[in-house]
Each structure stands twice: as C-alpha cells, then as structure tokens.
Amino acid sequence: MPKLAGSKTSENLKASFAEAAQASRRYLYFARQADIEGYADAAGMLRDMAEGEANHSLGSLDFLREVGDPATGKPFGMTQQNLLSAFQDESYQGNEMYLEFARAARAEGFDEVAEWFETLARAEKAHAERFRSMSAQLFED
C-alpha cells in the first residue's frame, strides 16, 4: 500500500478537513442568524447541514491519523497524543499567531480587530493550560 505522508492525497485530505470544519462552523453561525430573524426551519436545516459537515471533517481526519495532526504535524489518535497536539496548537495560537495577527491589524489601523486577536491570544493560552493540566493529571506520575 502506498504511503499517505507527502502525497497529493494527504494534502487533499487536509484541505477537505479544513473546508468541512469551516463550513460546519459557518453554518452554525448562519443558523444563529436565522433564529434571530425568526426563520426556525432555516435554522434547523442549517444546524443539520453543520452536523453533516462536521462528520465529513471527522472522516477526513480519520485518514490523516497516518500522517499527523493537520495543525501540528504531531501524531494523534490516542488521548495522550491528542492532548499534546492540542496543547502545542493552542500554545502556538496564544503565544505567536494571534499576537502577530494583532500587530498586523494594529499597524493597519484596525485597533478593534487587534483587540479581538489579543483576546483570542489570552483565551488560547488558557486553553493550552487546560490541555497541559489534563495531560499531567492523566499521564504523569
């Protein structure tokens, strides 16, 4: 059987995962707006579609276990691996990515967006700590 790592199929699985995961979240956002506007049937349909897209993303992620977490490249699948990969991704987002996004937004004059990114950085740091703490609780003697 061919190796998935480094293949075009691996890249396509990563793209499929990202697209379906983003669609799921967008559809939930759209459903909230439909609720606000009083369109209960549309909101329900959007939630159903969001669940379907979430399942599509999980199917692609199952194949990617052979390659590594699409966000970190680290092994994932077992809880200890998953917690470590999640910790590393949240740490990166909180300590680097969102702070850089905030700097860029501020440099372009988007102070409100910069503040949002700084809020996200703080949240991601807190998430990283939760992942670290759970990993320590479960897997460190």
Regions found by a protein language model. Name each.
Residues 1-141:
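Non-heme di-metal
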